[in-house]
């Protein structure tokens, strides 16, 4: 009876140690995978920023968005930017009929997110976020994530905010560059 109790105690201790090692190993594997994913995302965001820094016209921004958005996010998207008359123009639309221009206009005017996972237009399955630059809103990005639970994690939202800030800053830079060119052309015409 004593030896059976001794075997049972030894087995329980070994099972506890084995379970502990398994949990620690699983946690380390998970952390390593998250670190690798984060490293890849940072590298992609850096490449995206570099490509945007070279952009001289809006189409180059749209092309960079088409190239890098699928690499960083598991979501379909639509990009809307204002015309000179402040009308929102759809530049790229993977959302089809689910894109609501009324909600997009509200987001553009207010500069705040709306739709999915917000308190504004919460019934919508689309998440609308403003492309806010230093001076004003430069457009709206509408998204339908494959997995809303993963998409709205703080780390994913931080990545999205950095991504959006890069787009907004680039759109603003291009806008002011175009205004400067137009002004220069007008001044040249007045001199002649």
Set out the residue ranges of the language-model regions.
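Membrane-embedded alpha-helical core segments of multi-pass
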Residues: 13-21, 40-43, 73, 136
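Membrane-proximal helical linkers
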Residues: 23-64, 179, 184-188
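Histidine-centered phosphotransfer motif of kinases
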Residues: 192
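Conserved, well-folded catalytic cores of nucleic-acid-processing
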Residues: 18, 31, 38, 72, ...
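Alpha-helical transmembrane segments and their interfaces in multipass membrane proteins
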Residues: 1-15
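Membrane-proximal extracytoplasmic alpha-helices
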Residues: 7, 11, 40-41, 68
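GAF sensory domains
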Residues: 47-173
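Signal-transmission/dimerization alpha-helices at domain junctions
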Residues: 14-27, 159-182
């Amino acid at each position: 009876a004593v030896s059976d109790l001794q075997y049972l105690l030894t087995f329980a201790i070994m099972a506890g140690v084995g379970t502990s090692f398994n949990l620690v190993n699983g946690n380390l594997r998970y952390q390593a995978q998250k670190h690798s994913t984060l490293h890849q995302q940072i590298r992609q965001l850096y490449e995206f920023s570099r490509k945007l820094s070279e952009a001289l016209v809006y189409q180059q921004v749209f092309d960079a968005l088409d190239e890098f958005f699928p690499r960083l996010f598991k979501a379909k998207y639509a990009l809307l930017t204002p015309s000179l008359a402040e009308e929102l123009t759809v530049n790229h639309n993977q959302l089809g009929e689910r894109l609501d221009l009324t909600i997009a206009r509200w987001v553009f005017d207010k500069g705040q997110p709306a739709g999915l996972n917000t308190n504004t237009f919460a019934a919508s399955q689309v998440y609308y976020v403003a492309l806010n630059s230093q001076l004003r809103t430069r457009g709206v990005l509408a998204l339908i994530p494959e997995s809303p639970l993963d998409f709205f994690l703080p780390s994913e939202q931080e990545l999205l905010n950095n991504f959006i800030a890069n787009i907004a800053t680039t759109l603003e830079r291009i806008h002011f560059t175009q205004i400067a060119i137009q002004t220069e052309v007008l001044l040249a015409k007045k001199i002649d």
